[in-house]
A protein has these predicted regions:
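A conserved acidic beta->alpha catalytic loop
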Residues: 21, 36-47, 64
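Short, acidic, metal-binding catalytic loop of nucleotide-sugar glycosyltransferases
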Residues: 21-30
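Glycine-rich, basic loop-to-helix element that forms the pyrophosphate-binding segment
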Residues: 63-82
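Short beta-strand-to-loop acidic/aromatic patch adjacent to the donor-nucleotide binding site
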Residues: 84-96
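Conserved donor NDP-sugar-binding/catalytic core segment of glycosyltransferases
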Residues: 96-134
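A recurrent flexible, glycine/aromatic-enriched loop bordering the glycosyltransferase active site
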Residues: 157-172, 184-205
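A short, conserved alpha-helix in the catalytic core of glycosyltransferases
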Residues: 188-189, 196-215, 219-247
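Active-site donor/metal-binding and catalytic loop motifs
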Residues: 242-262
Length: 296
C-alpha cells in the first residue's frame, strides 16, 4: 500500500486539487490522509464533510497548529498504526503528481535501490526551477551555528530587514534570486544523488524507515530545516536516502503562507523567527549525536 499524507492549512481548493492529482492516476491500493493544522477558516471541517463517505480519503482534524513537522508527524503516526503501508508520501497541499505510472516507478526504484527515503524531482511552477536536492553536502555544526546566530540578529525590525522584505515582494527580483541560487549550486537534476538534503514539499518514506522511526520529522520545529535535520539524522544512522529524477512532481509554491501573510514584512519576520528556532533544534540534534552516538 502507498499512503499519501497531505498537510492542509486554510486553502481548501488547493488541497482538493492535490487529492484529485493523486486520484486521477488511478493507482491501486492507495490511501490519502489529509491533516488539517487547525485552519481558522473552518476549511478542515469543510474537507471532512467533503470527503465523508470516500473510503480512499481520511481527514484528520488536528487540535493545534504546531507547524509543518508536528502536523506531518500526526499523519505519519496515524498512517503507520492504521495502515502499516509500504510507502508514505508526505506532500504539501500545493504539490501535484506529474509522472505517469507514479506508483509503478516508485516500486521499481525501491526494488533496485532499497532506500529509506526518496526525494522526487520537484519543479516549482512559481519560480520555474528544480528544488530537490537542496544541496549536495550535509550541514556541519559550525555552519548551523553561524546560521542560528544570523537569524537571531535578523529577528529585529531593521532598515535592512525592511529593504529585504521590499525586494522579496517584487516577483521578478525574487524569482531571479532563487534561480541564481540554484544555478550556483551546479546540481544536475537529471542525475541520481545519494544521501543529500532533499526538499520538504514531497518526501517519500519506505517501510525500512517506517518500521524503525517514530516520527517522519524531528519534533520541535515549526517551519524550515525539517529535511536538513532529517538528512543529518539519516546520515548519522546510515540510512540510505536518495534523489531520483524518475519521479516528478509540480510545486505551486507558498500558497498557504501567502494567504496568512499577505504583508511581506510580516512574512519575513515570521520566517526569521522560525529559522532561528529550527536551527536551534538542529544544533541540539547534532549535539545529542555527538554526546550519545546513533542509538537514539
Amino acid at each position: 500500500m502507498i499512503c499519501f499524507i497531505i498537510l492542509h492549512y486554510m486553502v481548501k481548493e488547493e488541497t482538493i486539487k492535490c487529492v484529485e492529482s493523486i486520484l486521477e492516476r488511478e493507482m491501486d491500493n492507495i490511501q490519502i490522509i489529509i491533516v488539517d493544522n487547525l485552519s481558522p477558516n473552518n476549511s478542515g471541517q469543510e474537507l471532512f464533510e467533503y470527503y465523508k463517505g470516500n473510503d480512499i480519503v481520511d481527514v484528520l482534524l488536528n487540535d493545534e497548529n504546531a507547524g509543518f513537522a508536528s502536523g506531518n508527524n500526526v499523519g505519519y503516526s496515524y498512517t503507520k498504526e492504521k495502515y502499516n503501508p509500504d510507502f508514505m508520501i508526505i506532500m504539501n497541499n500545493d504539490v501535484e503528481l506529474a509522472s505517469e505510472n507514479f506508483d509503478e516507478k516508485l516500486r521499481e526504484v525501491y526494488k533496485k535501490e532499497k532506500f529509506f527515503i526518496l526525494g522526487p524531482d520537484i519543479y516549482s511552477t512559481t519560480y520555474e526551477l528544480h528544488q530537490s536536492p537542496k544541496r549536495l553536502e550535509h550541514y556541519t555544526y559550525q555552519e548551523v551555528l553561524s546560521l542560528h546566530n544570523k537569524f537571531n540578529k535578523s529577528k529585529e525590525i531593521t532598515l535592512f530587514l525592511k529593504l529585504k522584505s521590499w525586494l522579496k515582494s517584487n516577483d521578478f527580483l525574487r524569482t531571479f534570486v532563487y534561480q541564481s541560487r540554484v544555478k550556483s549550486k551546479d546540481i544536475d537534476f537529471t542525475k541520481i544523488y545519494y544521501n543529500v538534503p532533499l526538499h520538504g514539499s514531497c518526501v517519500i518514506y519506505s517501510k525500512l524507515f517506517i518500521d524503525k522511526e517514530e516520527f517522519a520529522f524531528q519534533p520541535g520545529t515549526f517551519f524550515y530545516y525539517e529535511t536538513e535535520i532529517l538528512d543529518y539524522i539519516c546520515y548519522k544512522k546510515e540510512y540510505k536516502t536518495m534523489y531520483s529524477p524518475e519521479l516528478k512532481v509540480l510545486h505551486h509554491q507558498n500558497v498557504s503562507t501567502n494567504v496568512v501573510y499577505n504583508n511581506m514584512l510580516k512574512k519575513t519576520i515570521f520566517a526569521n523567527k522560525c529559522n532561528y528556532e529550527s536551527t536551534g533544534v538542529f544544533l541540539k540534534v547534532m549535539e545529542s549525536f555527538q554526546e550519545n552516538g546513533v542509538d537514539q
